[in-house]
Amino acid sequence: VKRARVVVVGSYNQDHVWSTDALPAPGATRSGRYGGGPGGKGFNQAVAAARAGAGTVFLCALGDDATAMQARALAAAEGIDLRDEVHAD
């Protein structure tokens, strides 16, 4: 059986999420929680294709910052090929 090959053109995004138990009243301050993680529709599709067993190439633009390094590490861990990424810095 031949392995399917998939090419995804899209973006890698870093999701940032802040949450609190209730909205603050005008002038009030509330504490909250911060969380985040990898995302972007293109990256999520590439992960899904790779996990389904397809040979997956993800075409995207990445820079040199910590988010880009995280994207490269996550893609490598998922078996996603980034060799044709566009360097954007």
Show which residues each predicted segment covers:
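Conserved beta-strand edge residues that scaffold enzyme active sites
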Residues: 63-64, 89
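Structural motif
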Residues: 59-61, 85
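Glycine-rich phosphate/adenosyl-contacting loop at the front of the ribokinase-like
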Residues: 1-59, 66-70, 76
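A glycine-rich helix N-cap at a beta->alpha junction
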Residues: 74-89
